[in-house]
From Swiss-Prot:
It catalyses: 2-C-methyl-D-erythritol 4-phosphate + CTP + H(+) = 4-CDP-2-C-methyl-D-erythritol + diphosphate. HAMAP family: IspD. Belongs to the IspD/TarI cytidylyltransferase family. IspD subfamily. The lineage of its organism: Bacteria, Thermotogati, Thermotogota, Thermotogae, Thermotogales. Catalyzes the formation of 4-diphosphocytidyl-2-C-methyl-D-erythritol from CTP and 2-C-methyl-D-erythritol 4-phosphate (MEP). InterPro entries: IspD, IspD/TarI, ISPD_synthase_CS, Nucleotide-diphossugar_trans. It comes from Thermotoga neapolitana (strain ATCC 49049 / DSM 4359 / NBRC 107923 / NS-E). The keyword Kinase does not apply. This is 2-C-methyl-D-erythritol 4-phosphate cytidylyltransferase. The record marks 149, 201 as: Positions MEP for the nucleophilic attack. Keywords: Isoprene biosynthesis, Nucleotidyltransferase, Transferase.
């Protein structure tokens, strides 16, 4: 069984909106509904768990009804806590693989779901990532240091792992930037699937403006 975990419990404070970004309405749908649709429509995903904050539980339960939705789980104060809550919810089910995706990345392609999951099934762990094409600098007290960009990737989601591996990686109450980091610390190689610019994370107002433009054509582009 392959289960997707959709993380939608963040506050999105950097965006400066009263409503968490994943629940902002764009072209008639809340942002989290875009990746949710891709996950529900995917032939390789058997079930979906949505992780949301307590304040939004009732509204999400009322809004999303689908036979593939396994449960709506209360999120933690951090991303890592939210993932651990979802993994705990799945303890009795023990799926073979889990695919984790950030709801703040609304434009998820079904082909990326399939490719990341397939690679994880082959190697145990995989992530979507975008090869960097920009010049990189490190700024320290107005001093600029140029960082070689060769081999530099921007890590995206979805990320997929065997359930047992991700559960073991999150066995300690630690905080991580994503889910590949604790898995990598176990000595497991992370396979990389080439992503694209559409799978960006809505963080700032300019990201939201871009999302509004893409949403108008997403059904055609996706």
């Amino acid at each position: 069984m392959n289960v997707a975990i959709l993380l939608a419990a963040g506050k999105g404070e950097r965006l400066g909106e009263k409503v968490p970004k994943q629940f902002l309405e764009v072209e008639g749908r809340m942002l989290f509904e875009y990746p949710l649709k891709a996950l529900l429509d995917s032939n390789v995903i058997d079930a979906v768990v949505i992780v949301v904050s307590r304040d939004w539980m009732d509204r999400v339960v009322e809004k999303v009804k689908h036979e593939k939705i396994l449960g709506i789980v209360e999120g933690g104060k951090t991303r890592s806590q939210s993932v651990r809550n979802a993994l705990k919810f799945l303890e009795n089910i023990k799926p073979s693989y889990v695919l984790v995706h950030d709801a703040a990345r609304p434009f998820l392609r079904k082909k990326h779901i399939e490719e990341v999951l397939k690679k994880a099934q082959e190697t145990g762990a995989a992530t979507l990532a975008l090869k960097n094409s920009d010049t990189l600098i490190r700024l320290d007290d107005s001093r600029i240091e140029y960082v070689p960009r060769e081999g530099i990737y921007r890590v995206q989601t979805p990320q997929a792992f065997s359930y047992d591996l991700l559960k073991r990686a999150h066995s300690e109450e630690k905080e991580w930037a994503d889910d590949t980091e604790p898995v990598h610390r176990l000595g497991v190689k992370i396979s990389v699937v080439e992503g694209d610019l559409f799978c960006f994370k809505v963080t700032f107002k300019s990201d939201l403006e871009l999302a509004r433009l893409i949403a108008k054509e997403w059904e055609r582009i996706a």
